[in-house]
């Protein structure tokens, strides 16, 4: 709500996006315990791999996959374990059997259908996975930008640009800078379910051509520039720069593993905690550990 010059009260259609109900006290604690550590970890990895390249150090593949596997167990399962409670929380209601059953039904139908698509059209399923993850990660970072960094992206175009930039950097930047590794993962995943001997692997070959990768690079640049333009925020520009350098310099699997552990999952969990009135009060009072244990 905003006051007009004539004393009337005008409706502010973007007010709900400015803080997402995160109080200043809760925000300060989450910045300290969630945002700042993510900057430190990703920044440290950028510096570390600059040194790795400078001294020509080789990292065994198993060590590159380890953070990714750990992230799935330690953060992946917990960060999605309360998804069935989210719709009710978003409506400021207590979860009940009906709301939980509805979410579980929708999830089950989606999983069954999607699993079938993997066997019939694995290349399409892989592309859909990339697109869905891009949206999910971008939407999560959009919330963090608005609620924690207070970037003030009010327009729909600005929010769309932020979502695309934030989601595309982890999903598409490795394709631009590490095409061989990206292709290796894509072909390995697609071939697992390509039981009918379809041309699943060859169907994605175009994505690794220089022309397509150049188009992706241009898309990333435009999305990032548009995000900074709409936000006018140094925090937004700084985080985009950090993410861009990070995914351009750290090997993809290792980069995704640490990003998921220390960036996406922690911000997603922080978002869910902020939606819980009891957890939010504990965070604001400085009891961040109590809020987290309420989550787990």
Where is each model-derived feature located?
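Haloarchaeal acidic low-complexity proteome signature biased toward cell-envelope/secretome components but also
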Residues: 1-39, 148-152, 156-157, 233-234, ...
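Short, hydrophobic transmembrane alpha-helix segments
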Residues: 49-63
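Membrane helical hairpin/interfacial module
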Residues: 59-125
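Alpha-helical transmembrane segments and their membrane-interface exit regions
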Residues: 73-78, 130-142, 262-272
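Membrane-interface helix-loop-helix junctions at boundaries between adjacent transmembrane segments
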Residues: 112-176, 187, 194
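Alpha-helical transmembrane segments of multi-pass integral membrane proteins
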Residues: 134, 140, 159-182, 211-226, ...
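Membrane-interfacial helical/loop segments at transmembrane boundaries in membrane proteins
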Residues: 183-208, 282
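Membrane-water interface signatures at transmembrane helix termini and the short loops
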Residues: 231-267
């Amino acid at each position: 709500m905003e006051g007009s010059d004539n004393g009337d009260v005008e409706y502010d259609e973007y007010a709900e996006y400015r803080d997402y109900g995160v109080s200043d006290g809760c925000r300060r604690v989450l910045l300290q315990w969630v945002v700042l550590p993510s900057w430190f970890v990703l920044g440290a990895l950028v510096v570390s791999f600059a040194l790795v390249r400078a001294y020509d150090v080789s990292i065994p593949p198993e060590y590159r996959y380890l953070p990714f596997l750990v992230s799935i167990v330690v953060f992946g399962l917990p960060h999605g374990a309360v998804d069935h409670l989210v719709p009710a929380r978003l409506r400021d209601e207590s979860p009940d059997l009906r709301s939980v059953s509805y979410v579980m039904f929708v999830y089950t139908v989606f999983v069954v259908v999607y699993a079938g698509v993997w066997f019939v059209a694995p290349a399409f399923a892989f592309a859909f996975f990339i697109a869905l993850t891009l949206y999910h990660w971008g939407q999560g970072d959009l919330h963090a930008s608005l609620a924690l960094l207070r970037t003030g992206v009010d327009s729909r175009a600005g929010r769309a640009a932020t979502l695309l930039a934030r989601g595309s950097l982890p999903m598409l930047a490795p394709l631009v800078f590490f095409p061989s590794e990206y292709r290796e993962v894509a072909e390995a995943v697609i071939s697992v379910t390509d039981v009918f001997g379809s041309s699943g692997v060859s169907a994605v070959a175009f994505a690794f051509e220089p022309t397509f990768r150049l188009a992706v690079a241009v898309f990333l640049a435009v999305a990032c520039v548009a995000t900074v333009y709409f936000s006018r925020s140094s925090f937004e520009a700084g985080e985009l720069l950090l993410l861009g350098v990070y995914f351009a310099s750290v090997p993809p699997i290792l980069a995704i593993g640490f990003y998921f552990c220390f960036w996406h999952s922690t911000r997603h969990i922080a978002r869910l905690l902020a939606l819980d009135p009891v957890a939010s009060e504990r965070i604001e009072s400085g009891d961040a550990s109590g809020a987290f244990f309420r989550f787990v």
